[in-house]
C-alpha cells in the first residue's frame, strides 16, 4: 500500500467535519490521524485469507456473485439476530447477595458517596 499523507487540504476538511478550529491542539490531530492510517496499513498485511467455516456452503469467503463476503452483499453470511432466553431471576439471585426488587443493588458511585 502506498504511503498516504494527510495533506493540509484533507486536514482542513477533517477539522470542518469535526467542527474544530485549527489551533495548536487540533494540529496534533493530524499526526494522530496519520498514525491511525499507518496502523490500518499494518493490519491489512494480516489478511486471514479464505474462510474455512463448516457451517456455510461457501468456505472461500465469496458470495454467489463472486464478491468478498460482507453484510451489504450477502446478509445471509452473518448470523441472524435471534433472541435467546437469558438467565432466570432465580439464577441471577445466585450471582449476588445484593439483589433487591428484581435488580442488583450497587453502591452510589455516581454522586461520590460510595
Curated annotation (Swiss-Prot):
Gene: gatC
Protein name in the entry: Glutamyl-tRNA(Gln) amidotransferase subunit C
Catalytic activity: L-glutamyl-tRNA(Gln) + L-glutamine + ATP + H2O = L-glutaminyl-tRNA(Gln) + L-glutamate + ADP + phosphate + H(+); L-aspartyl-tRNA(Asn) + L-glutamine + ATP + H2O = L-asparaginyl-tRNA(Asn) + L-glutamate + ADP + phosphate + 2 H(+)
Keyword annotations from UniProtKB, A to Z: ATP-binding, Ligase, Nucleotide-binding, Protein biosynthesis
Subunit details: Heterotrimer of A, B and C subunits.
GO biological process: translation
Enzyme Commission code: 6.3.5.-
Gene Ontology terms, MF aspect: asparaginyl-tRNA synthase (glutamine-hydrolyzing) activity; ATP binding; glutaminyl-tRNA synthase (glutamine-hydrolyzing) activity
Superkingdom of origin: Bacteria
Sequence similarity: Belongs to the GatC family.
Reported function: Allows the formation of correctly charged Asn-tRNA(Asn) or Gln-tRNA(Gln) through the transamidation of misacylated Asp-tRNA(Asn) or Glu-tRNA(Gln) in organisms which lack either or both of asparaginyl-tRNA or glutaminyl-tRNA synthetases. The reaction takes place in the presence of glutamine and ATP through an activated phospho-Asp-tRNA(Asn) or phospho-Glu-tRNA(Gln).
Segments of this protein annotated with the region Disordered: 46-65
KW Ligase (keyword) present: yes
Signal peptide: none
Keyword Ligase: yes
Amino acid at each position: 500500500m502506498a504511503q498516504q499523507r494527510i495533506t493540509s487540504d484533507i486536514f482542513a476538511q477533517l477539522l470542518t467535519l469535526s467542527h474544530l478550529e485549527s489551533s495548536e491542539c487540533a494540529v496534533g490531530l493530524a499526526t494522530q490521524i496519520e498514525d491511525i492510517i499507518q496502523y490500518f496499513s499494518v493490519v491489512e498485511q494480516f489478511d486471514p485469507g479464505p474462510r474455512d467455516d463448516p457451517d456455510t456452503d461457501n468456505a472461500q469467503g465469496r458470495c454467489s456473485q463472486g464478491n468478498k463476503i460482507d453484510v451489504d452483499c450477502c446478509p445471509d453470511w452473518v448470523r441472524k439476530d435471534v433472541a435467546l432466553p437469558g438467565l432466570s431471576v432465580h439464577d441471577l439471585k445466585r450471582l449476588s447477595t445484593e439483589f433487591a426488587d428484581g435488580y442488583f443493588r450497587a453502591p452510589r458511585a455516581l454522586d461520590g458517596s460510595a
